[in-house]
Amino acid sequence: MITVREDTREETLILDDGLMIQETLERLAAKEIFSRQAAYCCYVRSRLCREALCTAQSFATARIVSGDALELI
């Protein structure tokens, strides 16, 4: 499981390595869990990696593992 944060909003998700980060953000925005701007977010910050990661890659490629927390930047 991973946690994704946007400002004061937070969602915990089951990690699917094959999913693209951008697709996940688009789904969260479509369900109105996150703002519409989240769908166009280009970077997230990983708590474990401590770096900004491009959302145009899969969770596996970005080396995001269960227990990580991502913040939209």
Spans of features found by a protein language model:
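A generic structural signal for short beta-strands and their flanking turns/coil linkers
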Residues: 11, 38-42, 66-68
